[in-house]
Amino acid sequence: MVHFVGAGPGAPDLITRRGAALLQTADCIIYAGSLVNPALLGLAKAGCAIYNSAEMTLEQVLAVMRQMEAEHKTTVRLHTGDPCLYGAIREQMDALDADGIAYDDTPGVSSFCGAAAALNAEYTLPAVSQTVIITRAAGKTPVPEREQIESLAAHGATMVIFLSIGLVNQVQQALLQGAYTVSTPVAVVYKATWPEERIVRCTVGDLAESVHKADITKTALIVVGDFLGTQYD
């Protein structure tokens, strides 16, 4: 049996009770590298085999799962945040389906929820925004043409942008092609809920400059919208 488990956004006490229980009983844990708080690995029982998937190919990960299954042992595949968002779990599940290996999913607290908590913010304010768009900029992973940031930005809704801080100049220009203006508020949240969490508040107009000045190059969310302002009904 393979359990896909969301580790949460960073703080180890934000993993779900179910997720923690699965870690405590697993025979094998395959975790998503530095994106997972190492404190969670301390929940593993004595003798648990622990693998860092950041140092493995997909086929190597699957080989470990198959070996554990052959030995009638349980594996926890520990992903950051909630695996349903940018977790790359579909290809693993398809392979397990092909092999006839049973699996299940335990959700986790996504980093976009952790970012809102860090900001003490509500994404959906009356008469401001009742829609949250979760997206990413096109990089190594392509984005469908209809889902380009400039197209989504036309809605002017609350937007949470994952995996794109290294493309911040491109993101800024795309946002300005939509309904956002240079004065639309933005928050960049680095490593939400981790001890080293940082928040940079700026506007769309000075987004790229602010990020470069703060020297944030990875592991950060860009959240955009008037929900960051002070006015609502």
Named regions from a protein language model:
Residues 18-22, 44-47, 92-95, 122, ...:
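Short, solvent-exposed amphipathic alpha-helical segments in soluble enzyme
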Residues 1-109, 208-209, 220:
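Class I S-adenosyl-L-methionine
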Residues 31-33, 79, 136, 163, ...:
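Short beta-strand/turn micro-motifs composed of small residues
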Residues 43-44, 63-64, 116-119, 136-137, ...:
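Short secondary-structure transition/capping segments
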Residues 84-155, 195-202:
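Class I SAM-dependent methyltransferase SAM-binding "motif I" and its flanking Rossmann-like core
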Residues 2, 60, 71-75, 131, ...:
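A contiguous loop/helix-start segment that scaffolds small-molecule binding in enzyme catalytic cores
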